[in-house]
Amino acid sequence: ATTMLDPQAYELMLPFLKENYGNPNSLHSFGSDTHKPLKDAMDKLYAGLGASDLDDIIITSCATESINWVFKSVYFDYILNKDRNEIIISGVEHPAVSAAANFLEKFGVKLITLPVNNDGISTPQNLKEVISDKTALVSVMWANNETGMIFNVDEMAKIAHEKGALFHTDATQAVGKIKIILKQSEIDLASFSAHKFHGPKGIGGLFIKKGINLSPLLHGGEHMAGRRSGTLNVAGIVAMGEALKIATSMLNFEDSHIRRLRDKLEDAILKMPDTSVVGKKEDRIPNTILASIKGVEGEAMLWDLNKNGIAASTGSACASEDLESNPIMNAIGAENDLAHTALRLSLSRFNTESEIDYAIEEINKATKRLRAISSTYAYNPNNYKG
């Protein structure tokens, strides 16, 4: 759902909240004093995303803004009064993507949703079967926000280009967790948010490949070369750049320490009877688990864990007020009772071994207690350890 702000990024942003608070567009020294820190931060973003100097990285408030910019500008620039009227998304996109796509249906856009397999991913073959010369945009996430499953976005981008369509990926869960080199990819557009890789909330960006033109979503001043109006959040940009620099420098740590802790937690859950996890470990980003614990309502588990200081969710935090069954579980064809048992657990580099041990203990205790009072589950206390 989010991450704590990295202490180094926090310290770096503080001066721009207190002393160096100038507007970069101002001509006086308070404004010009922000130019070098901004350039340094942008250099870190280009390096962290593996982008070419010829590409654009436009600062936005978050990935949701970036995604809405892509979809609505594609409608105006590539669909309205043109021969193309189709948009393709996967069946497990974040609500920011699915809601933006659903909105455009009201204006005559044909929305095609790709099916997903039992691991919760759409494949390049799924895309080949439905894409056509009418397709304007394909949008498939890089890594799923609930399962952590990684999609083959490079291959899907090639398929989109064969039909003359643009390819966008919601890279929010991938940036800072796996190696990304966008200049070696055919991806046209990639959106991201800083708070997913230990940067501050309220800041993100949109990668735009050289030669791709998008009309602005926000009109006003000539900020970001006229592509995104609004006074720049200097403190946020500086912290985001530093956070991404740190995250990309620690990718090997992510893939060893965090993956080991994640696997320890996952293995402990799977030792309990009637439990499952969506997706193979090796096909997921290193920090995410979407588990199903039969006989235990996801919301009941959340409340039990929360009172013991453990933060978990039943799905996307951006839809956490909706207590319906988990949409990912529905998409992979899980039975309705199982879809209500989803439990999402995510780790960061700041988690410790003792915290994982504590989480295992509390999940086991909560499972035993909740199954014992379940009207739909045959509870056998001998099946549990601890």
Regions found by a protein language model. Give the residues of each.
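Pyridoxal 5′-phosphate
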Residues: 1-386
